[in-house]
A protein has these predicted regions:
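Juxtamembrane inter-helical linkers in multi-pass membrane proteins
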Residues: 156, 164, 249-267, 304-317
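Glycine/proline-centered hinge or cleavage motifs at structural transition points of membrane proteins
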Residues: 161-163, 175
């Protein structure tokens, strides 16, 4: 009974949106299929596909490098690589715009070191970059956990048969972590289609942007867009649940009688790829974690110095917090 009540409570907003679309002044079918409705839907799906695909590749690569190779300091990297999750996308996007623009502290520090980081973060490219950097941990965390728990027998057999590490990864490891990659990618997809702050700052109009913009003067269109967003989210959630259950069943079949985690995961020596791998991990952490932190620290220091000079200090009340 409790589950039914909870489900009904969550279904009420969706039912209200559908009722408003059906009872609107325009034909629901014409409204849902009009170019002004489908255009933001296409942009949203385009951005979500790009972000989820990039996050899948980046998160999987980082998970493999930090859990299955002899990367220098990999225990440290395993701690800091998922930390960009602490930044809300809106805060991260604002920090990027401020820090990497000419005159920003990160831009100026890089210029002093001989690097040119001048870039205009806006539109599809800016939204894609920011959302990828702050959502790849949704792929990294489940993939890293899966890599750490895989039985080593399959990989050992492949190596004994003469397969190189890259071939072992593609033929043995990747099929076993595929469900984790797919589930994490769908979470990134869902996060992207529901995001408002980052796309707003990047001036890229998606469903959430258009819903907010049309909520006062074109409510029929606003509710139609909200219904599309709701249906898209439900499809993604259903797909994620299906893939997670299928992955659990596949994992049980693959492991069989083997005890998961009974031996340490095999370590792949990086060799000549040690420097590029370290550069990849350090570069991602620098962009996604350190760069926004520097910008936020610069904002805080600027506010403190302003208050010391007699200016208005930065104040927050409960309305701002809540």
């Amino acid at each position: 009974m409790a589950a039914v009540l909870v489900a009904a409570a969550f279904a009420l907003p969706g039912g209200y949106v559908a009722w408003r679309v059906i009872g609107g002044t325009e034909s629901p079918l014409a409204l849902l299929t009009s170019p002004r409705t489908l255009s933001p839907l296409w942009r949203t799906v385009q951005l979500a596909v790009l972000v989820s695909a990039t996050a899948a590749v980046l998160g999987t690569a980082l998970a493999w490098v930090t859990t299955r190779t002899d990367l220098v300091g990999r225990r440290f990297w395993r701690v800091v690589v998922p930390l960009p999750l602490v930044y809300p996308s809106f805060v991260g996007a604002a920090a990027f715009i401020s820090g990497l623009s000419p005159g920003g502290i990160v831009h100026d520090l890089a210029a002093d070191l001989g690097f040119d980081l001048t870039m205009r973060l806006h539109g599809l490219t800016g939204a894609w970059l920011v959302l990828t950097l702050f959502t790849y941990p949704y792929v990294y965390l489940p993939v890293a956990a899966r890599l750490a728990s895989l039985p080593t027998a399959f990989e050992e057999n492949a190596r004994l048969l003469g397969d190189r590490p890259a071939r072992v990864f593609s033929r043995v490891v990747l099929p076993q972590i595929g469900s984790s990659v797919a589930a994490g990618s769908l979470l990134v997809f869902l996060y992207t289609v529901s995001d408002f702050g980052a796309v707003h700052l990047m001036r890229f109009e998606t469903l959430t942007q258009t819903i907010f913009r049309t909520r006062l003067f074109d409510r029929d269109r606003s509710f139609a867009l909200a219904l599309l967003l709701l249906v898209l989210a439900l499809v993604v959630v259903a797909a994620e649940r299906t893939i997670s259950r299928a992955g659990a069943r596949r994992g049980a079949l693959l492991t069989g009688d083997a005890t998961v985690g009974d031996r340490r995961a095999l370590t792949v020596p990086l060799g000549r790829w040690a420097a590029p791998a370290t550069g990849l991990v350090a570069g991602v952490v620098g962009l996604a974690l350190v760069s926004p932190a520097i910008s936020l620290a610069d904002w805080g220091l600027f506010g403190w110095m302003r208050s010391r000079r007699g200016g208005a200090p930065l104040r927050l009340d409960w309305d701002d917090v809540l």
